[in-house]
UniProtKB/Swiss-Prot annotation:
This is Molybdenum cofactor guanylyltransferase. InterPro entries: MobA-like_NTP_Trfase, Molybde_CF_guanTrfase, Nucleotide-diphossugar_trans. It is found in: Cytoplasm. It is an enzyme of class 2 (transferase).
């Protein structure tokens, strides 16, 4: 039987470098950024959850469950992840950011294969050059470990997952897969890259 995988799209950040605009709702090629991520992820998972701390009515229009961080202090991505772990009964949870419009269409398959082959607790994606800490596949049972980490005042994702048996899933064959948008300039460059991809 195929493993059950749910996904959470993290849209809870402050997006200071985008002028404070809600990154998931910033338009790229006339569509909200998160819509690109949803399109890529939806065929790969059972359910999609959206973690958003503002504009929740707008996010709910996409037809998926929307939730805010249990702790309202903007503790970074881990706060959204730990809340998502409480909102899924799937065997695995895929975590992706809302501003990666070129996510691999085989993301879950490759991460799950790597994780199960090495009997790991979580898999982290890599573009071949560096790990992508907010693109991971993990077991929701790791929630208690993450809670203890946050309770100790820690915030950095890579510090947390380094405490566990994790594997790195390489996507060097898709170098743009995890390109994200932090500035208006990056948004323009990415829009041009996607348009080029669609024209070939």
């Amino acid at each position: 039987m195929a493993a059950q995988v749910d996904a959470v799209i993290l849209a809870g950040g402050m997006a200071r470098r985008m002028g404070g605009n809600d990154k998931g709702l910033v338009e790229l090629l006339n569509r909200p950024m998160i819509e690109h991520a949803i399109e890529r992820i939806k065929p790969q998972v059972k359910e999609i959850l959206i973690n958003a701390n503002r504009n929740q009515n707008r996010y709910s229009e996409f037809g998926f469950k929307v939730f805010s961080d249990q702790d309202s202090g903007y503790l970074g991505p881990l706060a959204g992840m730990i809340t998502a772990m409480s909102n899924t009964d799937a065997e695995y949870l895929l975590v992706v950011p809302c501003d990666c419009p070129l996510l691999p269409t085989d993301l879950v398959a490759r991460m799950l294969a790597k994780l199960t082959a090495e009997d790991a607790e979580l898999a982290v994606a890599s573009d071949g050059k560096r790990e992508q800490p907010v693109v991971m596949l993990l077991k929701p049972s790791l929630r208690e470990s993450m809670k203890a980490f946050l309770d100790a005042g820690e915030r950095k994702i890579d510090f947390w997952y380094a405490k566990h048996h994790y594997v790195v899933a390489e996507f060097s064959d898709q170098p743009n897969a995890f390109v994200n948008v932090n500035t208006p300039e990056q948004k323009q460059q990415l829009g041009e890259a996607i348009a080029n991809e669609e024209n070939h």
